Amino acid sequence: MDVRPKENFSQRQDTSAVRHRKTCKVNERAEIPSQPHNGTINGVNKRITKREGGEHISSPSRDAHVPVFILALVIVLSVSTRFYKITEPPHVCWDETHFGKMGSYYINRTFFFDVHPPLGKMLIGLAGYLTGYDGTFPFIKPGDKYEHHNYWGMRAFCAALGSCLPPFAFLVVLELSQSSTAALIAASLLIFDTGCITLSQYILLDPILMFFIMGSVLCMVKFNTQRLGPFSFSWWFWLLLTGLCLSGSLGVKFVGLFVILLVGINTALDLWRLLGDLSLSLVDFGKHLLARVFGLIMLPLFLYTTIFAIHFIVLNRSGPGDGFFSSAFQSRLIGNNLHNASMPEYLAYGSVITVKNLRIAGGYLHSHWHLYPEGVGAHQQQVTAYLHKDYNNLWLVKRLDNSDDLTGSPELVRHGDIIRLEHKETTRNLHSHFHEAPLTKKHLQVTGYGINGSGDVNDLWQVEVCGGRKGDPVKVLRSKVRFLHRATGCVLCSSGKTLPKWGWEQVEVTCSPYVKETPNSQWNIEDHINPKLPNISLAVLKPTFLEILWESHIVMIRGNSGLKPKDNEMNSKPWHWPINYQGLRFSGVNETEYRVYLLGNPVIWWLNLLSLALFVILLTVASLAVQRRVKMEGMMKVHCHTLMEGGGMLFLGWLLHYLPFYIMGRILYYHHYFPAMMFSSMLTGITLDILLQNLQLLFSSSLSHYLMRGGQSVLLLGFIYSFYLFHPLSYGMRGPLAHDSASSMAGLRWMESWEF
């Protein structure tokens, strides 16, 4: 099944800027150069050819016959496994409650907040819209019936992109190894993996992300094969398509940065190779450099920015995500109380206000009837920062002496004034004292204290307008204000830390002894109600596109790092993933419910793990052989290059998509491993194929041929049979759970941590 190109490099017409190069002889002992001519990471394997005067290493022809029948079979199997029972179960499963809802928001043009960039949700919403979904299903919780709503279009879109992964893997491995056997093994690992199937069948970001990651790798490999014809149409096509896929990867999730790094390393090595080519002028090298800067940096940045521009244009109506953003950001949203709003320009005594922290995603100053628990400072009313608009965000501005002059014109609050802030709902004053803050130990606790506005001297705060002078009035929305506590000298601050369950997971508010001006200690007056004052228009506050783009990224990054596990939810560990330690419940928990369980096919995953170890051993042996200039026969040279170049690129891709999770502080889930799993599967295809082909070193030619074909057949049949055993995990189960001996899955619970 191997595809070995027949055309010699020396027979090809080279019309590129690097034409007229000479093909160098290979030293009789040094059969493989220690530093391959085209770099360590690329998509072209060397081929050994015979010419007068010795052996040469040259690139395989790109005109070699592609095994169309095998590729067609891969496509058919991939599509059929992903679309089978696509409408079942007819209820919300796992994170469909998030991403289906967000697709609805796009259809309804309602603004929301999410920790991921918008492209994936935009495409889900577009798929739903084009297939007749009207955006009215609420997606409240897993298990809710879809009933008459057209949810299938969004699932089908995700399944279609998921169906592309095995064909992409086939083409990538075919380019890297020039072996259709290796390509078929790699594709089969993805076709028959129950985990990949499950992720592809629901309204999730994962199949969209993996589509763009695999597309980026395929386009990069294809671009590498165009080295003999730089600046040709196909050369530009694959370069620009690589940039397009990179922008798509990053536009779905920030995990796309890992494949950008992979392509960046490949590009850097490629440019280093060109720089060392003395037949290439510096002018031509500059053209190569500028072309890659345009195709792999400028184009992806432009497309990525365009994604956000469309996102902001479509989501122009106020929604549940408003409170995560600044007052200026909210003023552009139709339906928000700040959009085209008018309110009093200057703060006055007797005004009812909301106070928003200027730290991005800092929240509104908030209180409620709940008290700090015993052992956490004083047992008084909690004061927090809350990210959503709420009645408990309202505060009444009162004078130092607590008097209310209801007659005459209102008196403005000015820089240097000493005020009280009374919580509108509970009538307790904003208060601080010499008790330690709940989380930030060097800060002081902030509480609500007093009854009906009466309290003590610890309720007094001095207003300071940042950059202002004594007597300057406080401007609503535009003035940056700080509140200095008179009794302790500290400054009101939002620490950005999330309180435990007793604090309703809201943001900690403290009084900081560090009085230096920072966004954490700066606030602005957002809502302002005072019927005695004239109103002015706030339209001038709308921010520029670059300002909202920057703010969106800061909010996403902080939101992502702040994700914590829910109640009774296990935080998956990265070391769990390669060994398939534990899956995820997508639907159902008991024997009467329709159960779907995200778990990789254990035969495939454990084979991938074994192949990783085998690859490291083979790579070490090959590297030592090259370093010691060991003489090798023809096919051994090809296999050595395949391991070091094609295998090296895939191994690096696996490392880049797996190791960073060990240093992430956010909650992690099992499904985060699947991009790395794709690289592992492609590497398995190359590793096993090389092992099978090298059986000829141990056995006679005829016997090794039969053993190789037998090994290939055993592998493929093993994938199919293991898929047959575990397919209920993807397509649904009913009846007793696997720990019950009466269950049809009882004998398949090979690890106690599996919960199906």
Curated annotation (Swiss-Prot):
Tissue specificity as recorded in UniProt: Widely expressed. Has particularly strong expression in ovary, testis, liver, brain, muscle, heart and eye.
Protein family membership: Belongs to the glycosyltransferase 39 family.
Tree of life domain: Eukaryota
Membrane topology value: Multi-pass membrane protein
Functional summary from the UniProt entry: Transfers mannosyl residues to the hydroxyl group of serine or threonine residues. Coexpression of both POMT1 and POMT2 is necessary for enzyme activity, expression of either POMT1 or POMT2 alone is insufficient.
Alphabetic keyword roster: Endoplasmic reticulum, Glycosyltransferase, Membrane, Repeat, Transferase, Transmembrane, Transmembrane helix
Protein name (database record): Protein O-mannosyl-transferase 2
Organism annotation: Danio rerio
GO BP terms in the entry: photoreceptor cell maintenance; protein O-linked mannosylation
Transmembrane segments: 64-84, 110-130, 156-176, 179-199, 203-223, 245-265, 293-313, 602-622, 643-663, 672-692, 713-733
InterPro entries documented for this protein: GlyclTrfase_39-like, Glyco_trans_39/83, MIR_dom_sf, MIR_motif, PMT_4TMC
Chief localization: endoplasmic reticulum
Traits of the deletion mutant: Morpholino knockdown of the protein results in developmental delays at 18 hours post fertilization (hpf). At 48-72 hpf the tail is abnormally twisted, and pericardium formation and eye pigmentation are also abnormal. Swim bladders are incompletely formed. Glycosylation of alpha-dystroglycan (dag1) is severely reduced.
